[in-house]
Amino acid sequence: MARVKRGVIARARHKKILKQAKGYYGARSRVYRVAFQAVIKAGQYAYRDRRQRKRQFRQLWIARINAAARQNGISYSKFINGLKKASVEIDRKILADIAVFDKVAFSALVEKAKAALA
């Protein structure tokens, strides 16, 4: 029976993992066994954090809108409720952007929300 030599395949697999672990600290970028574990864990973190990123940005937008709304004398929840009643359909990402970069326009939106609540 012919002898099966698999050195090329194993080396290619190791090279692939070590390439993915490039930039990691110490043995995590040099030793295959440690690098493999680090790459697997990094993948798990990346998968989890792609979902968490969406939540975190929404939290950030809400915090910015709340701060700007309170400067205009209304709470976040009342502001959003007023916008819904005034049938203003602007998502939180754009509202946060307006709150940071265009305070005059945001104040106009607050007045519109207050009018809808009254």
UniProtKB/Swiss-Prot annotation:
Signal peptide: none
InterPro entries: Ribosomal_bL20 (IPR005813), RIBOSOMAL_L20_CS (IPR049946), Ribosomal_protein_bL20_C (IPR035566)
UniProt name for this protein: Large ribosomal subunit protein bL20
Keywords, alphabetical: Ribonucleoprotein, Ribosomal protein, RNA-binding, rRNA-binding
NCBIfam families hit by this protein: rplT_bact
Organism: Cronobacter sakazakii (strain ATCC BAA-894) (Enterobacter sakazakii)
Keyword rRNA-binding: yes
Pfam families recorded: Ribosomal_L20
Entry's Gene Ontology BP terms: ribosomal large subunit assembly; translation
